[in-house]
Amino acid sequence: DGKLYAYPLTASNGYFLFYDSNYLTEEDVSSWDNLLAAAEKQGKTVGMEVSGAWFLYGFFAGAGLDMYRNDDGSNTCNWNAIDTKYKGADVAEAISQICQSKAMVNCVNEDAQAFALNGEMIADVNGTWATPGFQEAYGDGYAATKLPTFTVNGDQVQMGSFAGYKFVGVNAYTKNTGWAMLLAEYITNEASQKAIGIATGEGPSNLNAAVSEEIASAPALAALSEQSAFADLQRVGNNYWGPGATLGQSLVEGSYTDVQELLD
């Protein structure tokens, strides 16, 4: 309606798969089975921060299991479900199976970019903020796509993900509120968002900037758009992050005896 209600900056706070097309085909990156097999065959690696609760969510959400924030700030979670199409334990075992591959590396963003730059890592689950690093590492092979499917009880299940946005905040108690609001308005205007998007790979929230040729043609943003069909808005309570990370680390290490007990 032409009115400014806030200062939205980006609409690309999600994750997808970067990969080097010099080593991997579109068929290779369509599933975790194919991806890891191709990497193992070539003596290369694939990265994802499985021990990060933000990324781990994608497996369980893709299998139709729930994690969401209630009005009182608590969470509703059925990742230990035994009466759903895909049991939580089956999903957890599928994650552990992925992590057992000698090509799979559980790593954070900075390490993944370093591994890609030295030629070791040919694919990584990451976000738009990592675009410049993977562009440099993969060169003319730089590519991106939606997240792979993974195998649960013999079925190929599409991974889900989180989707989110970033805003510029203004301190209402600053001595220079007016100037601060003008700065926020400048940072988030169409021209600035377009420039930031071109420089960093982030996706603008401004609709005109988002459809500009320079932005719309970016592989990472095209991949994010493709993944958005399987993404959920990030609506989880604060008590999710710690236990989620602990669960992810346990699945990475295989440090459990009873997966149902682990989920419970």
Task: For each feature predicted by the language model, list its residue ranges.
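Extracytoplasmic/periplasmic substrate-recognition and gating elements
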Residues: 136-200
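Paired acidic/hydrophobic, glycine-rich loop segments that form the ligand-binding mouth/hinge
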Residues: 122-127, 143-145
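Short helix-initiation/N-cap motifs at beta->coil->alpha
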Residues: 30-33, 104-117, 129
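Glycine-centered hinge/linker elements that transmit conformational signals in sensory
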Residues: 74-108
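Short loop->beta-strand "edge-of-pocket" segments that line small-molecule binding or catalytic clefts
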Residues: 34-48
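Short helices/loops that flank or line small-molecule/ion binding pockets
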Residues: 23, 37-41, 96-98, 110-124, ...
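Periplasmic solute-binding protein
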Residues: 1-30, 50-76, 162-170, 241-250
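C-terminal capping/gating helix-and-loop segments adjacent to ligand/active sites or protein-protein/ligand interfaces
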Residues: 162, 199-205, 209-264
